[in-house]
């Protein structure tokens, strides 16, 4: 299936059915009172996050979704039937934006999440509601309300804990294959990866994280060159970026340090927030070099990019803020286990810190509410 991560659609809810104007007409009841029923509600349009849906491709072909109108009311106090709702299944990670107001309508972040995109109109009132002591035979009823209508932009941003960043052919797809069950296409030419791939990295029965591989970036990506710029947005939800560098390119004219600096520059031009995310350096394809050559190239690379952070062999207790460096071979799995274990430790600690921060903010908010309560001179709360 073709991967589509953007689409524009129109949704329109159904109109409510009109209320009925009707009177009882039975034998021996010549002047029966009003018995017009209400109209049925119009159908609404909903979006539902579905973990089994991976792309927005169907919304490229069908662009308008119209719910049915409610039925009109009937005599004998019979209400019109309400119209069925329409439920649009969308991938988890879909951001829905109103094209007219630029308002974010919904951000579908978990399976089963359901959001109303267009609410169906209420049914009109039948004349039975307008009977009074001064008007025993009202002919008044109300029409059903119009349903809501919207033009929407759908944008899929994959949900992953870790994102892989790098030039085409840096070995990102090989890495995600080495550490997860994902099986992206791998070949010895640039732009083998044409759309994002997700892989679940399982540490043990209780710990795992999701890794995302996007098409490689090239210089000028922020201005639209290559494929990667279209998919950089998929890294915006990640908590950690891995910058994968090919330390042993087949083309001897390629300078890994210059390519790495170009990637960082493109990232900064594209989005300062994305540039500011925690980013670790992963030097790949060490299996192509002997140990001495690997160390020589690593030292030259680190000097060229101005790396002044700890190196893998340094005795250093990493903290949450310090970028980390790894030397691996994704093909032979050399160094990959240490990499995934450090990622897992980092993500676990990150979640713990975020949970503590949320609890502290909640406690502070509760204290503020209590302090704002009116008190008596003795400090006891006044009853409302």
From Swiss-Prot:
Principal location class: cytoplasm
- Amino-acid positions noted as binding GTP in the UniProt annotation, renumbered to this chain: 166-173, 191-195, 213-216, 284-287, 329-331
Write down the InterPro entries for this protein, in alphabetical order: G_OBG (IPR031167), GTP-bd (IPR006073), GTP-bd_Obg/CgtA (IPR014100), GTP1-OBG_CS (IPR006074), GTP1_OBG_dom (IPR006169), GTP1_OBG_dom_sf (IPR036726), OBG_GTPase (IPR045086), P-loop_NTPase (IPR027417)
Q: Kindly indicate where the leader peptide sits in this chain.
A: none
Cofactor(s) for this UniProt protein: Mg(2+)
Which ranges carry the Obg domain?
Answer: 1-159
Q: Does the keyword Calcium apply?
A: no
Domain of life assignment: Bacteria
Sequence positions that bind Mg(2+): 173, 193
Q: Mention any one GO cellular component term assigned to this protein in its UniProt record.
A: cytoplasm
Quote the subcellular location field of this record: Cytoplasm
Composition-biased stretches, type Gly residues, lie in: 33-43
**One GO term (biological process):** ribosome biogenesis
Keyword field contains Magnesium: yes
A GO molecular function term, named singly, is: GTPase activity
Domain OBG-type G as annotated: residue spans: 160-348
Q: Which UniProt keywords apply?
A: Cytoplasm, GTP-binding, Hydrolase, Magnesium, Metal-binding, Nucleotide-binding
Q: Where is this region: Disordered?
A: 20-46
Which enzyme class? Answer: hydrolase
**EC number(s) per entry:** 3.6.5.-
NCBIfam families in the cross-refs = Obg_CgtA (TIGR02729), PRK12297.1 (NF008955), PRK12299.1 (NF008956)
Q: Which PANTHER family match?
A: DEVELOPMENTALLY REGULATED GTP-BINDING PROTEIN-RELATED (PTHR11702), MITOCHONDRIAL RIBOSOME-ASSOCIATED GTPASE 2 (PTHR11702:SF31)
The record describes its quaternary structure and partners as: Monomer.
What is the recorded function of this protein according to its Swiss-Prot or TrEMBL entry? An essential GTPase which binds GTP, GDP and possibly (p)ppGpp with moderate affinity, with high nucleotide exchange rates and a fairly low GTP hydrolysis rate. Plays a role in control of the cell cycle, stress response, ribosome biogenesis and in those bacteria that undergo differentiation, in morphogenesis control.
Q: Which family does it belong to?
A: Belongs to the TRAFAC class OBG-HflX-like GTPase superfamily. OBG GTPase family.
Q: What is this protein called?
A: GTPase Obg
């Amino acid at each position: 299936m073709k991967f589509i991560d953007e689409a524009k659609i129109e949704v329109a809810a159904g109109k409510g059915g009109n209320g009925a104007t009707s009177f009882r007409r039975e034998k021996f009841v010549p002047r029966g009172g009003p018995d017009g029923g209400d109209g049925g509600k119009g159908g609404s349009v909903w979006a539902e996050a579905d973990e089994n849906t991976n792309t927005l491709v169907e919304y490229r072909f069908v662009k308008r979704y119209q719910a049915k109108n409610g039925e009109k009311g009937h005599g004998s106090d019979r209400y019109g039937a309400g119209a069925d709702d329409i439920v649009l299944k969308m991938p988890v990670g879909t951001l829905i934006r109103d094209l007219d107001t630029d308002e974010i309508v919904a951000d579908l972040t978990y399976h089963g999440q359901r959001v109303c995109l267009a609410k169906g109109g209420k049914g009109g009132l039948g004349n039975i509601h307008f009977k009074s002591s001064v008007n025993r035979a009202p002919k008044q009823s109300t029409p059903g309300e119009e349903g809501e209508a919207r033009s929407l932009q759908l944008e899929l941003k994959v949900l992953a804990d870790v994102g892989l960043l790098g030039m085409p052919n840096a070995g990102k797809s090989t890495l995600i294959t080495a550490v997860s069950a994902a099986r992206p296409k791998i070949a010895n030419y640039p732009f083998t990866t044409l759309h994002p791939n997700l892989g679940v990295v399982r540490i043990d029965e209780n710990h795992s994280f999701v890794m995302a591989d996007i098409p490689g970036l090239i210089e000028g990506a922020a201005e639209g060159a290559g494929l990667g710029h279209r998919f950089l947005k998929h890294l915006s939800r990640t908590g950690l970026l891995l910058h994968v560098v090919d330390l042993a390119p087949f083309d001897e004219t390629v300078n890994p340090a210059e390519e790495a600096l170009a990637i960082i520059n493109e990232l900064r031009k594209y989005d300062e927030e994305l540039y500011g995310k925690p980013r670790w350096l992963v030097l790949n394809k060490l299996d192509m070099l002997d140990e001495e050559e690997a160390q020589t190239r690593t030292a030259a690379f680190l000097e060229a990019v101005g790396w002044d952070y700890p190196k893998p062999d340094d005795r250093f207790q990493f903290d949450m803020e310090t970028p980390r460096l790894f030397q691996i071979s994704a093909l032979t799995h050399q160094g990959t286990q240490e990499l995934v274990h450090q990622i897992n430790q980092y993500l676990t600690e990150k979640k713990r810190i975020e949970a503590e921060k949320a609890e502290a903010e909640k406690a502070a908010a509760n204290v503020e509410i209590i302090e704002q309560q009116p008190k008596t001179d003795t400090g006891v709360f006044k009853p409302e």
